[in-house]
Amino acid sequence: MMALVMSVTMMAEDRVLAAAKDQKPRSPEEIPASLSLSLSEAQDYAVKQNRTLKNASLAVQEAYAQRWQTIAAMLPQADGSYTYSNYCGYTAEMTMMGNKININMPNVGALGVTASIGINGQGVVGALLNNIAIDMKKIALEKSEDELRSSIMSSYVSVLALQSITNLLDSSLNNIQNLERITQNAVNAGAAEQTSADQIRVRVNTLKNNINTQKRNIELATNSLKVLLDVPVETELTLTDNIDHILSPERVLTLLATDFDIRNNLNYQQVAKSAELAKRNVHMASWAYGPTISLAYNYSNQQYYGEGGMRMTPPNTVQVRVAMPLWSSGKRAAGVIEKKIAYEEAKNTLSEMTDNLAIQYRQLCFNLTNAYETYINEKDNIEVSQRVFNSATEKFKWGAASNLELTNASNDLINAQSTYVNAMLTLINAQADLEEFLNK
């Protein structure tokens, strides 16, 4: 029995220590100088490297260790001791029937071994409570992972969107700069006024400022993504996915067609486990009325180093003990009532969440549908605005459009680009929210 206990104990310790070793910091050699990642690869990489997620994983291992402590407390326990006593030549005196008797007190060594086992209802329920705690830690870990994946997707798409807009602005800038050169040549030849060239120069500077702003936004978004990936800012990051693949109609429609199973929702699972925990706490409080049964074995061996000495302690002792609580002035009863009230509160919270989640699901589906429709419209708007701008540029080149028309077309394109980015980010956030809600 003791060999089995030692074996299980060592297995539990090895499991916790192995998990802790897996979390060791990376050496400089393990930090990549460059990374090329698709969206799914970025999410998997972040799940593996993110420190917050590592802590959540360690919390699960910690819960396993706590459960083993509870179980081990109900398994056999053994303690050994050795005591050496030196009486420094002392001789005890006893008077018996008027006669004094001297008793030598030799040095003595005492070896003692105690083995015991005790169990009660609260200990058993405590082990069940630890199981629920482990489940809750696992749910929290899964929830943290889902939140991290959603954050990675939003950050990843933000970088792609800003890069796409910057490319469009670069193309528009090239067209405007060509017009600037043509107009300035016309001014130099006396075929146009300097005002026309100056107005186009203003548009050129405006686009340059806009491009510079977008480039700084790209750097900021990329650094935010690097933080989530837990890589240094010096690491060169290349995103290999494209927006059309991530924001595909098929993906959105498939998500909207997914049936809602409340049991898959992580928030529901957490509250349900809390209600189960509250129920077990009622059982725990009720077992305060239960008995505690314990069994103990004591072995004692005394060795006298010298003459004399009396062996008055039996070498082997077996004890069986049953302890039963009798009276606590209502303390235990109040404890049971308290836990029952807490259980009722937990059930009410669970019922309320069940209703709220059904409403939240409909709202998230509405948000995704609305965001997708807006994205499609804004995507079409930016294509139309780009065509209008290209047409106005070409007309202006041949004198068929005024500076005002060119300026309006340029402003419309910039506004369309800004609105398009906002629509794109709104869509990806709505998609991530519904995926996280459905635990997909």
Please provide the spans of the model-predicted regions.
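Hydrophobic, lipid-facing positions within transmembrane beta-strands of outer-membrane proteins
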Residues: 109-115, 316-322
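Small/polar (Gly/Ser/Thr/Ala-rich) solvent-exposed segments
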Residues: 54, 77-95, 117-147, 269, ...
